[in-house]
Structure formats: structure tokens, C-alpha cells
From Swiss-Prot:
Family matches, as HAMAP family: Ribosomal_uS15_B (MF_01343_B)
Gene of this entry: rpsO
Protein name: Small ribosomal subunit protein uS15
CDD domains linked: Ribosomal_S15p_S13e
Keyword Ribonucleoprotein: yes
GO CC annotation: cytosolic small ribosomal subunit
UniProt KW rRNA-binding keyword: yes
MF term (GO), any: structural constituent of ribosome
Organism from which the protein derives: Desulfitobacterium hafniense (strain Y51)
Disulfide bonds: none
Entry similarity comment: Belongs to the universal ribosomal protein uS15 family.
SUPFAM superfamilies reported for this sequence: S15/NS1 RNA-binding domain (SSF47060)
GO biological process entries: translation
């Protein structure tokens, strides 16, 4: 699970300005952290289908944010993809 300290660390790394918690980069980074955690969770809990639905919703939300960022500012999109190591 993501602790408050880990969340603050991610926000500080990806924020665009002081106090920024809602920019697409921050939201994508936080979703990626939660997706990574759940992916590891499913390696040991294969039959946890309720959480799998939540994972699929998060992946879809992250995809929508990435598409938005790609349309708005392609350079920021490429930077977040490379920083997080995502395939696109």
C-alpha cells in the first residue's frame, strides 16, 4: 500500500509548481504506483477479482490522462513516459 510519505515523495518529484497535486503528471505517477502495487498483489492473490476490476479502472484512467497530456503538450507526455518507464 502507498504510505503518506511515499505519496508526498511522488508528488514532490512530479509537481509542476509548489503545491501542485492535480496536474496530469502527478495523477499519472500516483496511479502508476498504485497499479504497480496491485500487479504485485495479483501475483500471490490470483482469484482477487474485485481488486482486479479496480486495477482495470485505474489503468483506463491513467490511459485517459496520458492521452490528454499527449494532445495538450507532447514534450511533457514524452518526459512522463520516460520517467515512469511506461510502454506507449
Amino acid at each position: 500500500m502507498m504510505t503518506a510519505e511515499k505519496k508526498k515523495e511522488i508528488i514532490a518529484k512530479f509537481q509542476q509548481h509548489e503545491g501542485d497535486t492535480g496536474s496530469p503528471e502527478v495523477q499519472i505517477a500516483l496511479l502508476t504506483e498504485r497499479i504497480t502495487y496491485l500487479t504485485e498483489h495479483f501475483k500471490t492473490h490470483k482469484k482477487d477479482h474485485h481488486s482486479r476490476r479496480g486495477l482495470l479502472k485505474m489503468v483506463g484512467q491513467r490511459r485517459a490522462l496520458l492521452n490528454y497530456l499527449k494532445d495538450m503538450d507532447f514534450n511533457r507526455y514524452r518526459k512522463i513516459i520516460s520517467d515512469l518507464g511506461l510502454r506507449r
